[in-house]
Curated annotation (Swiss-Prot):
Family: Belongs to the QueA family.
Annotated protein name in UniProt: S-adenosylmethionine:tRNA ribosyltransferase-isomerase
Pathway of action: tRNA modification; tRNA-queuosine biosynthesis
Subunit: Monomer.
Pfam families cross-referenced by the UniProt entry: Queuosine_synth
GO molecular function: S-adenosylmethionine:tRNA ribosyltransferase-isomerase activity
GO BP terms in the entry: queuosine biosynthetic process; tRNA wobble guanine modification
Localisation: Cytoplasm
SUPFAM superfamilies found in the cross-reference section: QueA-like
Gene: queA
PANTHER family according to UniProt: S-ADENOSYLMETHIONINE:TRNA RIBOSYLTRANSFERASE-ISOMERASE
Role summary: Transfers and isomerizes the ribose moiety from AdoMet to the 7-aminomethyl group of 7-deazaguanine (preQ1-tRNA) to give epoxyqueuosine (oQ-tRNA).
Entry keywords, A to Z: Cytoplasm, Queuosine biosynthesis, S-adenosyl-L-methionine, Transferase
EC code(s) of this entry: 2.4.99.17
Length: 355
């Protein structure tokens, strides 16, 4: 398939620049992957789509304040976006500057409300990423909390605000490391989670530290030629056990977000390669899911509306059928749903392969 097959026209005013006042106030477009049938509603309707005995799998990554501003010691402004924490004092990062810093370049980073500055050094370059070492005794996470900004996606097209520290973060986040939010999870608040559990729906948590690569455009014509960026994922034993128990009782595995889908399917892919049943997974993954992929774990998913020609709309198309998904997106535009990270959501069931 061609990347252009996944294009759709999106009016600029449908891009959500701010979240709704309440997490659960978003709209929900329900898509039956088997028939293509659509149903319009509110996000709280997700409760009606869940059955006792189902398993809801969330991504518990925490977004770090990964964007920093500063200058080279010799002058020249720069912007740093952390991609991955290497150790207590070093990161891999994207650097925007008029001239890329060379190894040994001293950096002066700031951004704290009290004018705090942090010294750092560019140690090495790894393709498009720069290895930056902080010349500060504090751990990286503490430095980022002091001077970093929330790394809002480029299409939100505004500076981060104090409210984003809470709203560009799920209520169940636990493990710091993401530089983009697992956005399907932003719609859940504690009262809704309590209702879900009260209904007899089980919950489990995987971790995938979403990287900035999630916003990179696909730069090839044929989707088969695309190489995914790599991200770290964890599927612990308790999740494997929960999936087995769900299967045994006839329940469904429902992933909240494409990152949860990719985590679970990465674990399945690794296990399948060893001809073994589903096993825990703690590794980098560059799994690329596009039409033709055979899903091993996930039966339904909650997901936001994604960018045209993105790997994420390709994943959803693989899940529910290309024609069904593109028709759903056209309907969403016509009905003026809000798109992308702070936008509305879909509840999608899987299209079963024809025997």
């Amino acid at each position: 398939m061609q990347v252009s097959d996944f294009h759709f026209d999106l009016p600029d005013e449908l891009i959500a620049r701010y979240p709704m006042a309440e997490r659960t106030a978003s709209r929900l477009l329900q898509l039956d992957g088997q028939s293509g049938a659509l149903r319009h509603g509110q996000f709280v309707d997700v409760l009606d789509q869940l059955n006792p005995g189902d398993l809801l799998v969330f991504n518990n990554t925490r977004v770090i304040p990964a964007r920093m501003f500063g200058q080279k010691a010799s002058g020249g402004k720069l912007e740093v976006l952390v991609e991955r924490i290497l150790d207590e004092h070093s990161v891999l990062a994207h650097v925007r500057a008029s001239k890329a810093p060379k190894p040994g370049t001293r950096l002066i980073l700031d951004g704290g409300p009290d004018g705090e500055k942090v010294d750092a050094e560019m140690r090495a370059r790894h393709d498009a990423l720069f290895e930056i070492h902080f010349l500060d005794p504090r751990p990286v996470l503490e430095i980022l909390e002091a001077i970093g900004h929330m790394p809002l996606p480029p299409y939100i097209d505004r500076p981060d605000e104090d409210a984003d520290k809470e709203r560009y973060q799920t209520v169940y986040n636990q493990k710091p490391g993401a530089v983009a939010a697992p956005t399907a999870g932003l719609h859940f608040d504690e009262p809704l989670l309590a209702k879900i559990r009260a209904k007899g729906v089980e919950t489990a948590f995987v971790t995938l530290h979403v990287g900035a690569g999630t916003f990179q455009p696909v730069r090839v014509d044929k989707i088969e030629d695309h190489h995914m960026h790599s991200e770290y994922a964890e599927v612990p034993q308790e999740v494997v056990d929960a999936i087995a128990a769900t299967r045994a009782r006839g329940g469904r595995v429902i992933a909240v977000g494409t990152t949860s889908v990719r985590s679970l399917e990465s674990a399945a892919k690794a296990s399948l390669a060893l001809s073994k049943p589903l096993a825990p997974f703690f590794s980098d993954t560059d799994i690329f899911i596009f039409p033709g992929y055979q899903f091993q774990v996930v039966d339904a998913m909650v997901t936001n509306f994604h960018l045209p020609e993105s790997t994420l709309i390709m994943l959803v198309s693989a899940f529910a059928g290309y024609d069904h998904v593109m028709a759903a997106y056209q309907a969403a535009v016509a009905e003026q749903y809000r798109f992308f990270s702070y936008g509305d959501a879909m509840f999608v069931t899987r299209r079963r392969a024809v025997a």
